[in-house]
């Protein structure tokens, strides 16, 4: 049995006035990020910064697999429940908020631990963010194949589900622009319209957001990205199915009904387009039988996980841990310990 209690010896992150350092834990949905983060928190003095575009919304607890009240109380968490579902939360806002939190947590003598699966946010912090993804021949070819099989009006309808703002501007026969909008969404997980309004630009000093603020320019030696990735995709698929079943049993449909009952939320809001919520909303609208919700929700979640893994593989500095390995948690804790101890040595701490 692995001991995850905080030891008496010094395993403390560097203290100010030293430059900030941070540890990051990324992975696809259902890969075990929350459990790993809490295990790290039992050993090291950390505060968790959520890197999840769905967890920012209040009243969306079950379908987002939000940490429980006990988990939130066990260690300080940030960027959870900070927006009403009526409000948007952009990548630019995340960069600005994360910048301030990394500095503040460091000033308190603790280590920022960034945890989540919104890869666009990680990319903004780690690499800077281009205005929008470049053309990808493989994605374009797949879209062209779908268009040949289904027709452009069908793809326009698919675009309307993920990017209603762009779809509203485009004619169903405007194949070139529909293809580009779908390409951007599939590559980034974000609608084309969000890139057109966010206006993030990458600079040599960091990322400048819509509010004119830059993220911290932290050298690679002062940051560590641990990536939870399955060796066996079937393992992750099983976890996704089990988690969706648990959400349904916990009252997920009632949670979506309560959101609809507010009367001020619409299906095209960013919050309501979150995976699971979109499918439940459509089922409640009668677009398909409620009996199909489970399969559609699981399918959409698997597609999300596939996109997340594609993003992760484009991050060369990540340190991969096979999340389906029996000793996955031990590996995560070893990487975290090495990172913290390396920082202590750099600062002359024992």
From Swiss-Prot:
Cofactor: Mg(2+)
Classification via Gene3D superfamilies: 1.10.20.140, P-loop containing nucleotide triphosphate hydrolases (3.40.50.300)
Catalytic activity: adenosine(37) in tRNA + dimethylallyl diphosphate = N(6)-dimethylallyladenosine(37) in tRNA + diphosphate
Alphabetic keyword roster: ATP-binding, Magnesium, Nucleotide-binding, Transferase, tRNA processing
Residue positions binding ATP: 27-34
Region (Disordered): 1-20
EC number from the UniProt entry: 2.5.1.75
Pfam families xrefs: IPPT
Region called Interaction with substrate tRNA, residue ranges: 52-55, 176-180, 273-278
GO MF annotation, one: tRNA dimethylallyltransferase activity
Disulfide bonds: none
Record-annotated site: Interaction with substrate tRNA: 118, 140
Chain intervals with Pro residues compositional bias: 10-20
GO biological process: tRNA modification
Residues bound to substrate: 29-34
Role summary: Catalyzes the transfer of a dimethylallyl group onto the adenine at position 37 in tRNAs that read codons beginning with uridine, leading to the formation of N6-(dimethylallyl)adenosine (i(6)A).
HAMAP family: IPP_trans
PANTHER family: TRNA DIMETHYLALLYLTRANSFERASE
Quaternary structure note: Monomer.
Name of the protein described by the UniProt record: tRNA dimethylallyltransferase
Organism: Albidiferax ferrireducens (strain ATCC BAA-621 / DSM 15236 / T118) (Rhodoferax ferrireducens)
């Amino acid at each position: 049995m692995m001991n995850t209690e905080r030891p008496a010896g010094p395993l403390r992150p560097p203290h100010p006035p030293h430059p900030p350092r941070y540890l990051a834990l990324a992975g696809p949905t259902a890969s075990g990020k929350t459990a790993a983060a809490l295990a790290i928190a039992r050993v090291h003095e950390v505060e968790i910064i959520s890197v999840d575009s769905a967890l920012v919304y209040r009243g969306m607890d079950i379908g987002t697999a939000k940490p429980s009240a006990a988990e939130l109380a066990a260690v300080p968490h940030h960027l959870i429940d900070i927006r009403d579902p009526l409000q948007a939360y952009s990548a630019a806002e995340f960069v600005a908020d994360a910048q301030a939190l990394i500095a503040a947590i460091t000033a308190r003598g603790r280590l920022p631990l960034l945890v989540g699966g919104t890869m666009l946010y990680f990319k903004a912090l780690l690499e800077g963010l281009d205005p929008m993804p470049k053309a990808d021949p493989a994605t374009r070819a797949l879209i062209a194949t779908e268009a040949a099989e289904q027709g452009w009006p069908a793809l326009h309808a698919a675009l309307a589900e993920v990017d209603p703002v762009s779809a509203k501007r485009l004619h169903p026969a405007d194949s070139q622009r529909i293809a580009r909008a779908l390409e951007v969404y599939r590559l980034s997980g974000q609608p084309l319209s969000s890139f057109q309004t966010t206006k993030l630009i990458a600079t040599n000093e960091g990322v400048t957001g819509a509010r004119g603020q830059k993220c911290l320019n932290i050298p690679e030696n002062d940051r560590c990205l641990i990536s939870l990735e399955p060796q066996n995709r079937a393992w992750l698929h099983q976890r996704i199915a089990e988690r969706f079943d648990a959400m349904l049993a916990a009252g997920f449909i009632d949670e979506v009904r309560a959101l609809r009952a507010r009367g001020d939320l619409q299906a095209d809001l960013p919050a309501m387009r979150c995976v699971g919520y979109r499918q439940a909303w459509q089922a409640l609208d009668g677009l398909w039988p409620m009996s199909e919700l489970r399969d559609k929700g699981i399918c959409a979640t698997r597609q999300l996980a596939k996109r997340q893994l594609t993003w992760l593989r484009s991050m060369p500095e990540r340190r991969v841990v096979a999340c389906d390995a029996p000793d996955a948690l031990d590996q995560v804790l070893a990487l975290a310990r090495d990172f913290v101890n390396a920082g202590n040595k750099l600062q002359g701490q024992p």
